[in-house]
């Protein structure tokens, strides 16, 4: 592919549309190289957003968008909604829907369309009610009002989950198979074809937020990190997502590749048994004190991880760097605890 360096995307943040990020790279593309091939993990079995966690794939493919999205500090920022406010009763939220947005079929995004989409989600997904419960949703022009059964101070944030992506429900009523063909959304891409092994997308010419970077995107499912790395090296794909720490060094010093690193929201942790001798809390504490997390992060994970000190990662703005870690690496403490227990 001329004019485009190979790209390696390591990690993925919540709410990030992969294809939107890739599109920013397309400064020099032409009609002869307007197809992007992305090696990725198999995201979904179908494109039905309410099934399992498949809505994440729809958003990652650049097909669906939500009312809000998150910035680098995980704060809610406008997306399909331009603003929102909470009523004095603490139960009523009013969202102003972006007047410039169209669905990929050309239909205008209205508050009524958002209402219908959210109601469909709640009707088809039991998981939706684990976020919040509403008593009434009303629409008036571009104003959407949601009344909830109790106070949800962070309702806009909850609506940023991919489960609540907004789709044109009239397409389904007119015979579209959402699971196979994907929803009609507001994102920069539209599904051309989809199987568990491969997704093909085309540019949404009705996209409201600028022209998408590539006319077509092909996403073969390559679940093994090493195989994804090999596909990138061989030129079978132009970009690979979530390359493992073991393959990271292959590309690190190669000028033919561009590495995009993003702070993840995920933790890697080990569950400790509390049975048998490990019922003793001092023995468990000794094992924890003997765990050199800094060394694991540096040597096993090739500096692509940071040593954990809390369940929440430092990418979430909860004062991670100010935490006092009572379980930090301390060999002498481990020895003392073991000695105490004989």
Describe these PLM feature segments:
Residues 39-86, 119, 184:
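N-terminal lobe/hinge region of extracytoplasmic solute-binding protein
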Residues 205-250:
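Ligand-site clamp/hinge motif
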Residues 85, 89, 96, 129-171:
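Surface-exposed binding/hinge segments that line
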Residues 1-36, 49, 75:
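Short, low-complexity disordered leader/linker segments with a strong preference
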């Amino acid at each position: 592919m001329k004019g485009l360096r190979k790209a390696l995307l390591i990690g993925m943040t919540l709410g990030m549309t992969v294809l939107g990020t890739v599109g920013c790279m397309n400064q020099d593309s032409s009609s002869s190289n307007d197809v992007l091939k992305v090696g990725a993990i198999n995201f979904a079995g179908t494109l039905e957003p309410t099934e399992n966690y498949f809505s994440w794939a729809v958003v990652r493919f650049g097909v669906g968008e939500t009312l809000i999205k998150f910035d680098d500090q995980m704060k809610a920022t406008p997306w399909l909604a331009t603003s929102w406010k909470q009523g004095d009763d603490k139960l009523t939220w009013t969202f102003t829907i972006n007047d410039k947005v169209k669905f990929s079929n050309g239909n205008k995004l209205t508050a009524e369309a958002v209402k219908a989409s959210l109601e469909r989600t709640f009707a088809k997904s039991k998981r939706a009610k684990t976020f919040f419960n509403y008593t009434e949703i009303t629409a008036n022009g571009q104003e959407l009002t949601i009344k909830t059964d109790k106070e949800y101070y962070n309702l806009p944030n909850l609506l940023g989950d991919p489960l609540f992506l907004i789709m044109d429900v009239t397409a389904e009523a007119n015979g579209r198979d959402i699971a196979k063909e994907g929803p009609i959304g507001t994102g920069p891409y539209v599904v051309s074809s989809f199987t568990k092994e491969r997704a093909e997308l085309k540019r949404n010419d009705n996209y409201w937020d600028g022209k998408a970077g590539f006319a077509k995107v092909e996403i073969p499912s390559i679940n093994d990190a090493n195989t994804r790395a090999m596909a990138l090296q061989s030129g079978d794909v132009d970009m690979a997502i979530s390359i493992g720490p073991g393959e990271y060094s292959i590309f690190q010093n190669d000028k033919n590749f561009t590495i995009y690193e993003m702070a993840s929201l995920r933790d890697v942790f080990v569950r400790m048994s509390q049975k048998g001798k490990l019922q003793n809390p001092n023995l468990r504490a000794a094992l924890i004190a003997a765990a050199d997390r800094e060394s694991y992060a540096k040597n096993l994970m090739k500096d692509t991880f940071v040593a954990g000190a809390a369940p929440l990662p430092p990418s979430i703005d909860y004062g991670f760097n100010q935490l006092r870690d009572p379980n930090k690496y301390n060999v002498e403490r481990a020895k003392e605890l073991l000695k105490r227990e004989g």
